[in-house]
Swiss-Prot record:
It is linked to Colorectal cancer 1: A complex disease characterized by malignant lesions arising from the inner wall of the large intestine (the colon) and the rectum. Genetic alterations are often associated with progression from premalignant lesion (adenoma) to invasive adenocarcinoma. Risk factors for cancer of the colon and rectum include colon polyps, long-standing ulcerative colitis, and genetic family history. InterPro entries: GalNAc-T, Glyco_trans_2-like, Nucleotide-diphossugar_trans, Ricin_B-like_lectins, Ricin_B_lectin. The chain crosses the membrane at residues 20-37. It comes from Homo sapiens (Human). Catalyzes the initial reaction in O-linked oligosaccharide biosynthesis, the transfer of an N-acetyl-D-galactosamine residue to a serine or threonine residue on the protein receptor. Has activity toward non-glycosylated peptides such as Muc5AC, Muc1a and EA2, and no detectable activity with Muc2 and Muc7. Displays enzymatic activity toward the Gal-NAc-Muc5AC glycopeptide, but no detectable activity to mono-GalNAc-glycosylated Muc1a, Muc2, Muc7 and EA2. May play an important role in the initial step of mucin-type oligosaccharide biosynthesis in digestive organs. This is Polypeptide N-acetylgalactosaminyltransferase 12. Residues 304-366 are annotated as: Catalytic subdomain B.
């Protein structure tokens, strides 16, 4: 009986249901139109400018946008180097673009925004399988200030054309108060036609840290993925980052950063073992090979690699965990130093910082920083004051100006450290970064190494390439008291260490020579690196049985330290001075 009645009434009820559904859909459409109009009226400085609404579609494991075909003979179509043979006005325009952006934008404008990069990952990465339906969705946040059109748009298209639709919640561009005309209405119009893209404009210049926080506060994704504004994403870059955060929410994961040449736009990525981040005692970020202890821990060449620090421009983090950790230090200005501060905080407060070898993103490293980093010193001081405990003195010894730098109030950041019950910096050095040599800095045995006879002259070492510190001669130069290239340490192993940089250098005397040359320090000091700083100030080289003397360089007005037979001359007397009086 129940069944027959139900069958007879079904068509009528179905019609009524359909009519009600149509009315409901119409009301929802009107409400949606009203909200869109309100959003458009309210858009302005500081407001988000939304792209078109997402529409469901089949095959959501495919990228958000298909990559349009690029002719194989197009400039740089597969990431190869391009060298234009220019003359006259064209050459002038190219040089002007480099002067303005520190990147060859003249060339960038002639390379497709949709070019395909060559594969630069370990072949084992292709075999990885992902549970797309259960991975978290991400908001990709790209902050920019006066960025060139082609590098910015190539970054956006690269994200959309390589990110699975099901995993990408949105792309948020944060305009940090740019004043270039192409980044105003023209950019808004371009982005309005792209799916899942939003534009947020700051009301004033915020700097990288606070601009990224504007994007983070507006983000709807479970994971925040930060990218710089001149990047290109490799196929399969996103899944490994999200998979790792799905496995471990307290993991902050970086892609392998592949170099894109600023002048030729050649993609220089490689599929070999990536490097990890470190720092030197000036609090400057450095790259290092993966230590043997980490290789032993890894079970596969495509496992995540633990890294003491990160470069800072490109990483993914759970939004909840980012907020739990205290996001960024908003007392930091513009950019510089925030990457080390965040790295210390991740490790010391219970997280883990990793690089995933299956995630590759190309990055254009400018010829030099296009904007001032005059706030970077204060940012580094904030990091040292909050996280480094007594080891901050090693930083101040090598950078005396930092002691005098105003750095603002760090009370809240220290309270955050207490609240999260974070570990001390000694734990970080012993557990996370045992490869970093911790200087002794014994009183009276570090600083400027000054000569008594040649008044106001100090040991000085300034290699032409900061990335290749060995093999050059130590000279004498007027003492400046700023640390850096005039900072040396005399150790209990009888070494004279140049340890403002990584890797550290030790002064050596090569066979048959009388000059002082910089070599790499070794675990046990070899004989040609051993000196005795005697009570009278003589600097005695044990192997040669000679003393270091301040001498005039042949056919020159400059001075150098040379080995000579020992005498009682003041030109053979040396003393350390921590800072200028």
């Amino acid at each position: 009986m129940w069944g027959r009645t139900a069958r007879r009434r079904c068509p009528r009820e179905l019609r009524r249901g359909r009519e009600a559904l149509l009315v409901l859909l119409a009301l929802l459409a009107l409400a949606g139109l009203g909200s869109v109009l309100r959003a458009q009226r309210g858009a302005g400085a500081g407001a988000a400018e939304p792209g078109p609404p997402r529409t469901p579609r089949p095959g959501r494991r495919e990228p958000v946008m298909p990559r349009p075909p690029v002719p194989a003979n197009a400039l740089g179509a597969r990431g190869e180097a391009v060298r234009l043979q220019l003359q006259g006005e064209e050459l002038r325009l190219q040089e002007e673009s480099v002067r303005l952006h520190q990147i060859n934008i003249y060339l960038s404008d002639r390379i497709s925004l949709h070019r395909r990069l060559p594969e630069r990952w370990n072949p084992l990465c292709k075999e990885k399988k992902y549970d797309y339906d259960n991975l978290p969705r991400t908001s990709v946040i790209i902050a920019f200030y006066n960025e060139a059109w082609s590098t910015l748009l190539r970054t956006v298209y690269s994200v959309l054309e390589t990110s699975p639709d099901i995993l990408l919640e949105e792309v948020i561009l944060v305009d940090d108060y740019s004043d270039r005309e192409h980044l105003k209405e023209r950019l808004a119009n371009e982005l309005s036609g792209l799916p899942k893209v939003r534009l947020i404009r700051a009301n004033k210049r915020e700097g990288l840290v606070r601009a990224r926080l504007l994007g983070a506060s507006a983000a709807r994704g479970d994971v925040l993925t930060f990218l710089d504004c001149h990047c290109e994403c490799h196929e399969g870059w996103l899944e490994p980052l999200l998979q790792r955060i799905h496995e471990e929410e307290s993991a902050v994961v970086c892609p392998v950063i592949d170099v894109i040449d600023w002048n030729t736009f050649e993609y220089l990525g490689n599929s070999g073992e990536p490097q990890i981040g470190g720092f030197d005692w000036r609090l400057v970020f450095t790259w290092h090979t993966v230590p043997e202890r980490e290789r032993i821990r890894m079970q596969s060449p495509v496992d995540v690699i633990r890294s003491p620090t990160m470069a800072g421009g490109l990483f993914a983090v759970s939004k909840k965990y980012f907020e739990y950790l205290g996001s960024y230090d908003t007392g930091m200005e513009v950019w510089g130093g925030e990457n080390l501060e965040f790295s210390f905080r991740i490790w010391q407060c219970g997280g883990v910082l990793e690089t995933h070898p299956c995630s590759h993103v190309g990055h254009v490293f400018p010829k030099q920083a296009p904007y001032s980093r005059n706030k970077a010193l204060a940012n580094s001081v904030r990091a040292a004051e909050v996280w480094m405990d007594e080891f901050k003195e090693l930083y101040y010894h090598r950078n005396p100006r930092a002691r005098l730098e105003p750095f603002g109030d760090v009370t809240e950041r220290k309270q955050l450290r207490d609240k999260l019950q974070c570990k001390d910096f000694k734990w970080f050095l012993e557990t996370v970064y045992p490869e970093l040599h911790v200087p002794e800095d014994r009183p009276g045995f570090f600083g400027m190494l000054q000569n008594k006879g040649l008044t106001d002259y100090c040991f000085d070492y300034n290699p032409p390439d900061e990335n290749q510190i060995v093999g050059h001669q130590v000279i004498l130069y007027l003492c400046h008291g700023m640390g850096q290239n005039q900072f040396f340490e005399y150790t209990s192993q009888k070494e004279i260490r140049y340890n403002t940089h990584q890797p550290e250098g030790c002064i050596a005397v090569e066979a048959g020579m009388d000059t002082l040359i910089m070599h790499l320090c070794e675990e046990t000091a070899p004989e040609n690196q051993k000196f005795i700083l005697q009570e009278d100030g003589s600097l005695f080289h044990e192997q040669s049985k000679k003393c270091v003397q301040a001498a005039r360089k042949e056919s020159s007005d400059s001075f150098v330290p040379l080995l000579r037979d020992c005498t009682n001359s003041d030109h053979q007397k040396w003393f350390f001075k921590e800072r200028m009086l």
